A protein has these predicted regions:
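Structural motif
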Residues: 1-5, 45-53
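Cytosolic C-terminal regulatory domains/tails of membrane transporters and channels
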Residues: 34-36, 51-54
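Conserved beta-propeller blade repeats
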Residues: 1, 21-40, 80-83, 129-133, ...
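Multi-bladed beta-propeller domains
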Residues: 8-26, 56-79, 183
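Short flexible coil/turn linkers enriched for glycine and charged/polar residues
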Residues: 10, 33, 44-45, 90-93
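Cap/lid segment of the alpha/beta-hydrolase catalytic domain
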Residues: 67-188
C-alpha cells in the first residue's frame, strides 16, 4: 500500500499494483536496456517469491523465476491478514497489521500477541515467519502496531515519536491494545 513507481524521465508517479499485505524486499533492474525489474517479495503468509515484471505493461504482470524452491507454511490457506487504522490518543490514525485464522471468532477470548517498534525511523514490513504462523494456526492473533517513531509513513511519522514526542510511541501501542479489546479480538 506504500509502494509507488516513479518514472525518472518524466517524473510521473503511479501506484505499484502489487498484492496487498506483501512486502517488496528487493527491486532492481533486470537489465539496463529494457523496462523489466527483478522483484523479491514476501508477506505475512507467503514466503519469499522471486520474480520479474515489465514496467511497460500497465497491469505489471508478475512472472515467477523458478530457480528457488518456494516453501510455504502448510496451513497458510487457513490464515489471512488485514490492515486497519486505529485512532490514537490524539486522533492520529495508526496503521495496524492483523494476522489471524480465517475462522476467527470475535468473542473477546482470543490470545493476542501485539508487537510494536517505533524508533530510528525503522519500518516493520510484512515478513514471513513459520513460527508466528504456527502460533496463529493454533488460534492466536498476531498484531503489528506501526507506531510513531518508525518509518512507515515517512520522516514526519518518525519525528512524531522522537525525543519530546516519544510518548506517542507507547500511547499508539496502548491505543492499539484498546482497539483490539473494543473490537472483541481479546480482553484485558
Amino acid at each position: 500500500i506504500y509502494h509507488k513507481i516513479v518514472n525518472l524521465n518524466t517524473g510521473e508517479v503511479s501506484p505499484f499494483p502489487y498484492p496487498e499485505n506483501t512486502n517488496l524486499t528487493y527491486v532492481s533492474p533486470f537489465s539496463e536496456d529494457n523496462d523489466k525489474i527483478h522483484i523479491i517479495r514476501s508477506g505475512w503468509t507467503t514466503a519469499s517469491t522471486y520474480s520479474y515484471a515489465d514496467l511497460a505493461q500497465p497491469s505489471l504482470p508478475e512472472k515467477k523465476l523458478g530457480f528457488r524452491k518456494e516453501f510455504n507454511y502448510p496451513f497458510a490457506e487457513n490464515i489471512t491478514s488485514k490492515e486497519v487504522f486505529v485512532k490514537g490518543h490524539d486522533g492520529v490514525e495508526i496503521p495496524v497489521s492483523i494476522v489471524y485464522r480465517k475462522d476467527l471468532e470475535l468473542n473477546s477470548k482470543n490470545t493476542v500477541l501485539v508487537y510494536g517498534y517505533g524508533a530510528y525511523g525503522y519500518s516493520t514490513s510484512a515478513f514471513y515467519s513459520p513460527i508466528l504462523l504456527n502460533l496463529v494456526e493454533k488460534g492466536a492473533v498476531f498484531v503489528v502496531a506501526h507506531v510513531r517513531g518508525g518509518g512507515e509513513k515517512g520522516e514526519d511519522w518518525h519525528m512524531a515519536g522522537f525525543k519530546q514526542t516519544k510518548p506517542n510511541t507507547w500511547k499508539d501501542l496502548n491505543s492499539t491494545a484498546q482497539w483490539l479489546i473494543d473490537n472483541e479480538y481479546t480482553s484485558p
